[in-house]
Amino acid sequence: MLFAILAIVSYAQNGVIRGTVTDEIGLGLPGANVIIESLTIGASTDVNGNFTLKNVPTGTQEVAVTFLGYATSISTVTVEDGETVVLNVSLKPGVLIGEEVLVLGDRLKGQAKALNQQKNKSNITNIVAADQIGRFPDANVGDAMKRIPGITMQGDQGEARNIIVRGLAPQLNSVMINGERIPSAEGDNRNIQMDLIPSDMIQTIEVNKAVTPDMDADAIGGAVNLVTRAASSGMRISGTAASGMNLLTNKPIWTGSLVYGNRFADDKIGLVVSANYNNHDFGSDNVEAEWEATAEDANGDDFDLVYVGEMDIRQYYVQRVRRSVSANLDFKLDENNTIYVQTMYNWRDDWENRYRTTYRKIAPTFDANGDINGWEGEMRRQTKAGGTIYNDRVKDRRLEDQRVLNGTVRGEHLFGNLDLNWSFTAAKASEERPFERYIRYEQGDGLPFNYDINNTEFPSFTAVNPADVAVGMFTFDELTEENQYTEEMDYNGRIDLSLPTVIADNTGEVKAGFRYRGKQKNRANNFFEYAPLGSNLDDMSLVANEDYSKDNYLAGDYNVGTFVTPEYLAQLDLHNETLFEGQEVPSEYLAGNYEANEAILGGYLMWNQDLTDKLAILAGVRVENTAISYVGNVVENEEDLIRQEKGEQNYTNVLPGIHLKYDATDDFIIRAAWTNTLARPNYFNLVPFQDIRPDDEELIKGNANLNPTTSMNFDIMAENYFKSIGLVSAGAFYKNINDFIYTFVDENYVDADITGGNEWTFFQPQNGGSAVLYGAEVAFQRQLDFLPGFWKGFGVYFNYTYTNSTTEGIRNGDGELRTDVALPGTAPHLVNGSLSYENEKLVVRASINYAHDYVDEVGGSAFSDRYYDRQMFVDVNASYAFTENLRLFVEANNLTNQPLRYYQGVRERTMQLEYYNARFNVGLKFDMFKK
């Protein structure tokens, strides 16, 4: 194949046409078609609006530029042998509909940019532009992405954090910034926290659902590329200033953003700087429950009984501050050589207090006849805070400090007909939790409870005798301080080469490249327990305390109760040996500490060729070699380290792929793809650690023998684009997955050396057998401009995704194969919809986002499986343009007060229920020097 391709590569040193296509205000237009129709030579502009036409015959040529929603431009240039001609084109908005010229409003221009890119891609992709992101009230990239077909998100404290693409869990997808991978600040997995990045910082979101050979292969669900802003053709300053309120805490939200862009030195240097600040003081009302299937009778024998064995009532108060800065430079050395410098820094602080009431060791009591006559257990109250006495930044709260810094230098060079592109990226992600403190008081075993299980979605416990839970009845149990730190460093490099090809007057290119990805990850935590040397902490009445119960607890009729205040806990001088005796507790952290190093070498060969004026093929193969080494800790008991265990893996994957694109008409496109992808195990899953927890009767092990998950994928998609800006599409997908990874759970594990003959619970990540995932997507978006008068201002945005999956190879605790389990993350139904109205000044939009419930984590049996419950979010936003440069906007999120809910086994058994309430924002957007 290689020699056949090289035989038809055109080496004639004719000429080259290069340039940039911009809109009327100087912003690059991505996805524009640039073509010399008489020669069938053409190209699409990149994300910044740049294009290159190679191997152009000498002489006078007419170059046509087309873009959805914009008038076609035709330019005449003279091409000389071996020379590069620069052609910059500025398009004007307007499209001929019948005999009427429709001029796009500002709100539709962003949609036009996204649809043009999507239309001209060789692979199946969804693209959302910055202007379109701004049409929804989404503060971070995660919330913006849940509007895209086939994507659902898992939330944290009411914000979208982890991405699920086409029913595949976060670790089966990849996330990039400007085409380069970014490291993860998560301690034990590869997930990228999408709520770390404000949506204002992004110019374009690309979701590649069928990857091409020149992309990293570890993207079974999809590869997400976040493209930051590029410099416009002239000076531009835009920004946002807003404030709002969260109804759970009734505290303000502050948001600000600023973008500056310009070109200097006769347009040879471009600069764009973006900054964003968001300060959100919020919280959540939470209950959590663990359900049991058996209990002990009066004789100590097990019998079947479904009940809550442990339950928490939790009150969270969180202040989340996001700061992001991005600076991008481009240097046009000459018409054939450009250097880019791209940087981005994201920093998020979460300050959190949590008040946690726990009912535990719950068990039935029996009368003389052996019938249940009541319930008893133990009650605990715990405060979470931070050691402000040693670090002012923690502010009496637990501080989670997450930062991601990435910088890329890349070059684009043209030597005759040879394109040479290269890049080098260095990136660092870190998460630090300094001086995290917990203090716990308890009311001991045998406390009688009233247990209300009439509604299993809202189980509740109360003390039979209220005097038993008075403040003075809670005695000191535990006081701890811990420090957590996770760091990941990435060093990535690539070289890509491409040459034009011609077959029977149909153009194409052959492309080859080499890729290196190096990664270093480590987690270094510690944990200390402190005992007071005096009696001044003996019971809760002796210390500063406060009742944090509230009348309108959103999770149900619960009272969280009285706790030690975080201010008191924060100022305890735990390191003073005259006041406290400290002891390190290795069992709480040592097994979780590890080091991992990963090196991935990749190469590819790819041919992208027009076979006719309607049919194009992209075919190629990618080869990736993975080498991983890691060090983990084997812990014998709660205090002793046996040894450090080392391990390594080395494997190679060969991953061919074919993409077909058929342009039935100028606006109707059919795509099909066969691809092969993989997902590497989470780092911590590979670490050969052992964690023995006698108090909990649990044994947890890593698995150095895990194989990577591989998938063969088939996709088909049909798209019809409307000239008046819109799209209707339908497609289907099928994935044959091997060696998927799940957590094996044995609830009756016995090991004479470890458990002493008792039955413990054993956890270990293992490879399953095979899985099949399939589904379908439909999407429709259009401004209803064909309607008369007032009605033409309405617009519709809708998409629906169906997914289903089956698995083979998941075993229960008895070693039996389970046949009733879907892949975690497979939500059967996803729906997005919005109805909007806009005229020259006013825009109003109401939107919904719905995700059906799905398996989130496989347990030891169907009874223990954890499900992520269905969710439906309703948001409304509106804006009014005072001038072309100034717009007022109003946003309302989560108007239905949609909670986060997990359930255990069946929907009636609540496992976690967490409410956040609605939030509102109002502000101004400005765009200065807009032409």
Describe every region a protein language model picked out.
Residues 734-736, 755-854, 896:
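Gram-negative outer-membrane beta-barrel transporters
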Residues 85-89, 141-144, 161-164, 176, ...:
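N-terminal periplasmic accessory domains that precede
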Residues 54-55, 181-209:
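Short acidic/polar hinge/loop motifs at secondary-structure boundaries
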